[in-house]
Amino acid sequence: MKMTVSQAMVECLKAENVKVVFGYPGAAICPFYDALLDAENDIRQVLVRQEANGGHAANGYARISGKPAVCIATSGPGATNLITAIATAYADSIPIVCITGQVNTDQIGSDVFQEADITGSAEPFVKHSYLLKDPEDTARVFKEAFYIAGTGRPGPVLIDIPMDVQKAVIDFEYPEKCEIRSYKPTTKGNYVQVRRVMAALEEAEKPLICIGGGVFAAHAENEIRELADIMQIPVITTMMGISVFPDDDPLFCGMIGTHGVKMANAAVNECDVLFLVGARVGDRAVKTPLALEKTTKIIHIDIDPAEIGKNIGADLPLVGDAKLVLQQMTELAKPMKHDEWIAHIKTLGGERKYVEPAKGTVNPRVFIDRLAKKMPANVTVVADVGQNQIWTCTEYKFRKEGRLLTSGGMGTMGYSVPAAIGAKMADNSRATVAICGDGAFQMSFMELA
């Protein structure tokens, strides 16, 4: 069917079941926006006040919907404004497809008005980027972009499209499948290694599971809960893994790290086998990895082989999708008991006391604790960056249906308000709360307009 590339771009989004896009128009992306306007009954446009906030809104939408979300910007400063949001998504492995306009093909490299090398500028922060110069490549590029963004270790993909290309007329047909010879993520775990991992967990006297954000990325929340329950292994999380495991579960022992809770950190120091699932184990999670490696057998599951051994050595590395690997493990799992070990961990935290604030003041820890008690179970809490993030992570008690979103890797202030908007649009049935400090609020409060 003949149509313009802009119209074909809209058809690509429809084929990928995109219902909402977040962005801000400008001259270099106007042909695409005109086509979107004609499709307003199928795709809702959310007009943000700054391009990075469109990226953050797409970030929140992707986390709750579980599929790649779309943000749009024009060329030059519009595209460069988007880089912080791209880097934020990359650091936390969030699947977003970023579409930017570009100057006409014959003007690229001439330093014309609002020209910026966005593919080069964003290169460190994307899984892949495209400069779409051949109109006939439109369908293939979009199919690949959504596939790359949402598979393997998720992340942002950038498509930069010159204005003249958007206006070109092509014969459009969207491919049903995507085959990229150089990109084939390992999803299922090596069976021999899975058996070794299970043997190590069965032999352990003081096993401990550490959950990272990769469990959310793999949609493996139920699988990790089931395995932990069968084998009765206590659970801790990194910041990005918070809310995978409900706080009221007897196996849950809190967040690890510099800003974590005493009980979780003490458990790491005493365990004999540490089972890392989808966790990067960055500097805020484990300060002294070399010391831990000497005393503890470490099992590390991650879909990205580059993460295994990067920050902490692994005795038993296992590359694969957390959901599929955990299913393999559950099939082999035997019911076990670690009652004494779990009871001991519960004594390591000491008694947590709240100091009632003086009249006319607010204790933020008390505030967040009380907020958690008043909110419904199926709440999405979006924490910004700063001390408010730490208070939320340590004081908010999530129930099974709850979900925490935050910028854990990049630590991007101003994230919470637009991300909460995106999260709410992904699932309107969920209560959604943004928790932020005054500085972060002033960076993105205009999105409430």
Please state what every model-predicted region is:
Residues 2, 19-20, 63-74, 79-100, ...:
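Structural signature of the thiamine diphosphate
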Residues 2-87, 91-92:
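N-terminal cofactor/phosphate-binding cores enriched in small/glycine residues
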Residues 6-14, 18-19, 27, 32-37, ...:
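Active-site diphosphate/adenylate-binding microenvironment
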Residues 24-26, 45-56, 71-78, 133-134, ...:
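Active-site nucleophile and cofactor-binding loops and adjacent substrate-binding regions
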Residues 29-32, 53-57, 77-86, 90, ...:
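Short glycine/serine/threonine-rich phosphate/pyrophosphate-binding segments
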Residues 63, 213-299, 399-429, 442-446:
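Glycine-rich, anion-gripping cofactor-binding loops and their flanking helix/strand elements
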Residues 99, 107-114, 270, 308-311, ...:
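Thiamine diphosphate
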Residues 136, 295-385:
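Phosphate/pyrophosphate-binding active-site segments
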